[in-house]
């Protein structure tokens, strides 16, 4: 239904209906509000081939909400394309995604985003949860990811893949990389595992002290609560101006706040008398 003018147009490959002003469209559990709705009908079957909502678009289906300037639904591919010149928004339970363009697949729950964007999770904190990287012991279940390349989200396997110019924020820790794969809990969006590669740079704040780590790959999972940083030939950990460690493999045990280095490495430590000490 709409409060404005309804226009009909007949073309060789489709019949077109255009609804204007305060449009509301419902089908099953889905509802779409928009300023304009254009429906393309197959001239033979008289069934909908494609529908384009434009203007201030707000769509909902169960716990899922989508906002943007354009929403295109294609019957053949069973996918919806959500677009906005600024940022389109997709919300599902504890998951929030923003990007200029999103492709949402109905049957698989897959989301493809070919443009820069951000992903945020907002789950309730649970006692005993630790950070997914860095060494702070603050419990935090939320993760914020920004990327400059693209993102693919697979709801069936609860995975998200990110590429290029990635920034991951978790409490007071930042992870920068160019490739990232994260998995979430089956029942919510608590972070279950993470694997990052290419241009790894971790910045962690603990009180007034900043520590940094650099390497080629970092992994973490919720079972053992250990962050594993590797580098070729070395990964590097620097704790302010007090200590620097070079090793092929550095493990951060978050429950005990300990660090283990594997392989041949080097430790540089500044003594209280400001003289440097080196161990290999």
Q: Which positions does each model-derived feature cover?
A:
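N-terminal amphipathic/hydrophobic interface segments
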Residues: 1-280
């Amino acid at each position: 239904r709409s409060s404005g003018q309804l226009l009909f147009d007949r073309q060789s490959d489709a019949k077109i209906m255009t609804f204007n002003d305060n449009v509301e469209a419902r089908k099953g559990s889905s509802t779409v509000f928009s300023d304009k709705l254009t429906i393309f009908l197959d001239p033979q079957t008289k069934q909908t081939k494609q529908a384009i909502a434009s203007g201030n678009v707000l769509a909902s289906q169960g716990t899922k909400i989508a906002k943007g300037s354009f929403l295109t639904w294609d019957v053949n591919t069973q996918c919806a394309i959500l677009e906005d010149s600024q940022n389109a928004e997709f919300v599902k339970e504890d998951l929030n995604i923003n990007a200029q363009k999103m492709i949402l697949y109905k049957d698989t729950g897959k989301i493809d985003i070919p443009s820069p964007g951000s992903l945020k999770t907002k789950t309730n904190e649970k006692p005993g949860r630790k950070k997914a990287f860095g060494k702070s012991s603050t419990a935090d279940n939320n993760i914020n990811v920004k990327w400059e390349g693209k993102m693919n989200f697979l709801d069936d396997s609860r995975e998200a893949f990110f590429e290029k110019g990635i920034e991951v924020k978790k409490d007071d820790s930042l992870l920068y990389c160019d490739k990232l794969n994260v998995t979430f809990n089956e029942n919510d969006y608590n972070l279950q595992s993470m694997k990052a590669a290419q241009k790894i740079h971790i910045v962690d704040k603990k009180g007034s002290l900043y520590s940094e780590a650099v390497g080629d790959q970092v992994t973490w999972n919720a079972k053992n609560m250990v962050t594993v940083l590797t580098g070729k030939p070395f990964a590097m950990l620097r704790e302010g101006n007090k200590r620097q460690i070079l090793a092929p493999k550095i493990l951060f045990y978050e429950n005990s706040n300990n660090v283990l280095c594997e392989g041949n490495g080097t430790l540089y430590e500044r003594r209280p008398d400001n003289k440097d000490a080196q161990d290999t």
